[in-house]
Amino acid sequence: MAKNAMLCLLILRVVLALAFATNKKGDEEPENHSTGIFGKVGRVVTVALAMSSRLGGADATRGGGAVYGRDLKSNQLPNNNWMAPPPPMAIRSAKVYDSKHSPAEYLKKFAQDFRRKTGMHSQRHHEETTLEQEKRVAGAGPDPIHHQDTTLEQEKRAVPAGPDPKHHEETTLEQEKRAVPAGPDPKHHEETTLEQEKRAVPAGPDPKHHEETTLEQEKRAVPAGPDPKHHEETTFEQEKRGAPAGPDPIHH
C-alpha cells in the first residue's frame, strides 16, 4: 500500500509540474491560447497515464511477478494442492487378453460370472437336469428314456432273476419255477397241470376237468360203487337195500 501511495503522489507531482509549465508557455505565446485550459489538461493527463503504465510494467518485471507492489502469492488459496489433480482411481477392467486362452473361453467365463452375479440361468437349465446331476441322484445313472422305463441294469439289481422281457406283463419261466417247485403252468395258470393235480389229489386229476367224478373216486366214496347212469337213477341193488320189499317194478 505504501508503494502505491508513493507512486500516486509522484504522478500528481508530474502532472502539476506539466500544467504549470504549459500555463507559463501560454502566457508567453498568446497565439496558442485558443486551445484552452481543458486541452492542456487533457494532454497532461494522457502523458501521466502513459508514464504510470510504463512504470507499473517495469516494477512488475523487476519485482518477479509483483503488480502494484503486491505479490501474486498472496492471492493463492490456503490449500497449496488446489490445482493438484485428484488421486488416481482403481479401475476394474477386464483382464488383458492372454495367448494361453482363446476368446471363446473368455466369453464363456464372462457369461458364467454374469449369471452367478445376477442369478440368471439359461432356459435349458430349468427345463431339464443335466446328466451329471442325474448320476449323482441315481447311482446307476440316468434313464436314457427319461425315466419312462427302468433300465435292464436297474431291474437286475431289484430282481436277482433279471427283468421280465415283456415289461412285467407275464412272469418268466425261471421265476415261476422258484415260486412253484413243480414249475409254471404252460397255459399261464388257466388250468392246473396233471402233475400238480396228482399231488393235490392222490387218485389223480379228473380227465374231464372235474366236471364228473371218476369211477375210482366214486367207488371210494360209495362202497357199493358208482351209479352207471351218473346217479340219475338208483341201482336195483341200492333200492333193495333201501326198501326191504324190493324196488318198485314200475320205476325201473
From Swiss-Prot:
InterPro entries noted in UniProt: CLV3/ESR
Whether Nucleotide-binding counts among this entry's keywords is: no
Q: Where is this region: 6 X approximate repeat CLE?
A: 136-252
Q: Which GO terms describe its biological process?
A: cell differentiation
Region described as Required for secretion from the host cytoplasm to the host apoplasm: 21-83
Tell me the leader sequence span: 1-21
Give the subcellular location: Secreted; Host cytoplasm; Host extracellular space; Secreted, Extracellular space, Apoplast
Tissue specificity, in the record's words, reads:
Highly expressed exclusively within the dorsal esophageal gland cell during syncytium formation in host plants.
Superkingdom of this entry's organism? Eukaryota
Stretches forming A- repeats: 127-135, 148-156, 169-177, 190-198, 211-219, 232-240
**What ranges cover the CLE- repeats?**
136-147, 157-168, 178-189, 199-210, 220-231, 241-252
Q: Which GO terms describe its cellular component?
A: extracellular region; host cell cytoplasm; host extracellular space
- Molecular function via GO: receptor serine/threonine kinase binding
Q: Which residues form a coiled coil?
A: none
Biased composition annotated in UniProt, kind: Basic and acidic residues: 125-137, 144-242
Q: Which family does it belong to?
A: Belongs to the CLV3/ESR signal peptide family.
Q: What does this protein do?
A: Mimics host plant CLE extracellular signal peptides that regulate cell fate. May play a role in the differentiation or division of feeding cells (syncytia) induced in plant roots during infection.
Q: What is the protein name for this chain?
A: CLAVATA3/ESR (CLE)-related protein 4A-1
Q: Which organism is it from?
A: Globodera rostochiensis
This protein's gene is called CLE-4A-1
